[in-house]
Amino acid sequence: MGQQKTILRALAGETQAVPPIWMMRQAGRYLPEYRATRAQAGDFLSLCYNPELAAEVTLQPIRRYGFDAAILFADILLVPQALGADLWFVTGEGPRLSTITTDADFAKLGPASDVHETLSPIYETVRILSKELPSETTLIGFAGAPWTVATYMIAGRGTPDQGPAHALMQENTPLFEALLARITEATISYLSAQIEAGAEVVKIFDSWAGSLKGEAFDKYALEPARQITAALKARHPHVPVIGFPREAGEKYIGFHAATGVDCVALDNSVDPEWAAEHVQVAGCVQGNLASRHMVSGGEALVQDTRRIVKAFSKGPHIFNLGHGITPDADPDNVQRMIDTVREGA
């Protein structure tokens, strides 16, 4: 029955009359049931590392909305923590990490093979979900792309322009490339373990890919994505991979072929008609409604949703947002989006 799942059919290249739908950050603070479970966990990281509660928040949007996929509840910064970086979250400000800016800092990191000790609760979450999800729902695992994860490890926090990572790339290229290689190796291990625990699809989030230009994009966004995808395909040939090089612009063209991913997720700066012509010709695309519509709602939500469905209707497409849903979103607007996508069913 596995291939009857709508997400897997899209990822296999099938054009469907009604695209399957899920939503980045669909388990999140916009949902009252999520806020209640997070309060029970105590804090964000405790929620990530509690398999029963992490599975519960992953299931909540499936119960409420009947999305075609559930995405594992975790965080891209668990990998640096598993490598030995200190990680904590500051309320209202986001993540903080101990920084990796010198060879001595890098030497303190553990080998990629050691990540499973820290990450084993995540695999348990996947195992619980693979048992508890409805049979028609696809389970998606994920990790951050090496470049994006490195930007946090180098700066110790999110930065508007990823300046510290760009500076290290220029000033100590061997260290920068060694860090990327370590993250790449750990990511292959992590995603492979998620698949072995029951993930049916994996997604690589390169949230800051757009700040890499020209040759740097090819070396530090495309190449790690290619390495991760190739390694996963060698071990798990039937498991599809979704790549998300956010704000890659023209570099979305050719991303399927250059990396080997089965699907390319598009941010909402991308014109859907342009992407249908230039990106979807190479394979499945995912996206790309602006997440602001989940806040504002109204007729604009319906019109933009219909436009995206129509633009991508001639090829394989998974409907999603172009960015994660925000905490101020209205849950009713999510339902309206889903109803609009499925109105042709």
Swiss-Prot record:
- Annotated signal sequence is none
Q: What is its EC number?
A: 4.1.1.37
Q: Where, per UniProt, does this protein localize?
A: Cytoplasm
Keyword Signal assigned? no
May I have one GO cellular component term? cytosol
Which CDD domains does the UniProt record give? Answer: URO-D (cd00717)
Q: In which pathway does it act?
A: Porphyrin-containing compound metabolism; protoporphyrin-IX biosynthesis; coproporphyrinogen-III from 5-aminolevulinate: step 4/4
The protein, known as: Uroporphyrinogen decarboxylase
Native source organism of the sequence = Ruegeria sp. (strain TM1040)
For this protein's source organism, the top of the classification is: Bacteria, Pseudomonadati, Pseudomonadota, Alphaproteobacteria, Rhodobacterales
